[in-house]
Structure formats: structure tokens, C-alpha cells
Amino acid sequence: SKKGTVRANHYHPIQEQKVLLIKGQFISIYKDLLKKDSIKITHVVNEGDLIVTKPNVAHTMVFTKDSIFLNLVRGEREHENYGITHTIKHVFVEEEERKMLLENYKLECRCCSSKNLKRVVSLGYQPLANNLLNKKNSKCELYPLEMNLCKECFNCQLSITVNPKKMFSNYLYLSSTSKTFVKHFETAAEKYIKEFKLSHKNSYIIDVGSNDGVALKPFKDKKYKNILGIEPAKNLAKLANKNKIKTFNGFLEMKNIRKIKKNADLILASNVFAHSDNLKEMAECMLKLLKKSGIIVIEVQYLLNTIKDLTFD
């Protein structure tokens, strides 16, 4: 099969099927048709992998490389390929989804570039956060919500990267709606001021992925004048600027560095690295904006505590 093509889009009502990938790579998409609450799941099949498809499991292969595989079906083959006992067509990966998977699927770790990724959990296909519909029959874009673990550097990450412009140009989550978040950033600001000896007259503070300005507001309330948010969502940057929290509307990337004032004493990045597909470029940009004696504070989710404390919904 050639790179970019699709095979299968069917299921076997009786036979079990085994596929041994000799060369290449493909994304396997499957769903158990007998289970009412079954979800559509994806995973990457690499050279040497053997996958077993049980009866009544709809499956499709989207090829990311030119591939050669052995297709083994247990059962009599003296009949047409499509028939009542052997293979029944079930198209559940359309052209639009094929393109989405080929464009957005992550085949290597965002941190160390290893291809040794292990699937931890699949929650099926989901819409973007807070992407609520106005009309009952409206269609919304769905993406696999699945988490992988890199077996080399142990970074946990999603299997899909959504186009950041689609995700953040008009972001639908306001951080200030969470009282817990507001209190957290108020406490954090007090800690940073004391620990890093920040001056409300001279210290320059940047918050990356500043949302509506929730992390910078405590500094503003304490009369810190030299603060800057960096926020790609136009609606949130506009709201923050309206609330007198100076905010640059754009992504933190090399092409935007020249537009942003440098020599920051403190750069904050709270819950923002998990949203980035290019972690190294983001880190390099921060270093270019930081003064030599400056400090970067990065806040990221830690999976063990997330599970232990049930801090998810």
C-alpha cells in the first residue's frame, strides 16, 4: 500500500484477522461494533508489529509510509473477498478524517524525538474544549483524545496535534472563571515577589500563554507597571488589553521575537507547554527574552499527581 492511502473500512463477522507489517507504517483505526458504548480508537503500527482484529471489529488502515504487510485470516478463503461470512464493508474513515490523521498524527516524541511511544489511554474522538454548537444538527470537528507515554524520556503527550491557529486564534476557555486558578496565581505572585526580590518599579515580567491575564493581574494590583502577556487568542488578548494588562497577540515563536521587548526579569509559563507542539522552539524563545540574571518558572501537569488527586474531569 502506498503512503497516504486507505485500506479496509470493513469488518469480519466471523473470522479473526491477523496483520503482520513487514515494511512501512500505518495508523490503525478500529471500533467494536457489538459493544454499544464502544469508542473509535487509533494506534500506530510499526515494522514487525502483529495486530489481531477480532470478529465484528470495524477497522481501517491509513498508511503514513509505503508499506508491505501479510494479511492472515483464519477461516475458509474459497469465496469472494466481500461476502456474508468473510468481509462486510463498513466505511467509518472518510476522506476528511484521512487527511486529518495524516496531517496531525504525532509519530515521535515532542521532547526527545523518540518513536518509542506507548498508548496509555484512549477516550475516543472528541471536539475541541468548550466548542459548543449553536444548532442541534450542526457538525463539529472531532479529534482522537488519546495519551501516549514516551518510553525514552517519559513525557506524556497527546497522539494528535491540532493546528494551533484553529485551537487558539479564538480560544474558548477563560482562566479567570476558575476561582482556584485565581487564588493559585495570587499566591504564586506573592511568592515570586518575595523569593526573587522583584521591584514594582524596575522588574519586567512576561507571562507566556497569558489567557485573559489571570497570572499577571496580581502584579498589576500591586502596582507593577512593566508586565506583558503573550497570548495567541485574539479574543483573550483583546480582553486582557481592555483590562489594562498589556498583551501581545501572537504565538511565542522565533518570527515574533523581534516584536517583543526583551530582558525580562521573570518569565512565567503556566500550563502552556502541554499545548505546544514545538517545545524546543518555545524554550529557545524564552531564553532570548530573558536577561542573564533572569528566571523562568514553568508549570506543567504531573501525571502521577493528576491521577492520585483526581484533578481531572
Regions found by a protein language model. Name each.
Residues 33-54:
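Short acidic-glycine-tyrosine-enriched beta hairpin
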Residues 280-295:
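A short glycine-rich, Lys/Arg-flanked "PGG" loop and its adjoining helix->strand segment in the class I
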Residues 298-313:
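Short, glycine-/aromatic-enriched active-site segment of Class I SAM-dependent methyltransferases
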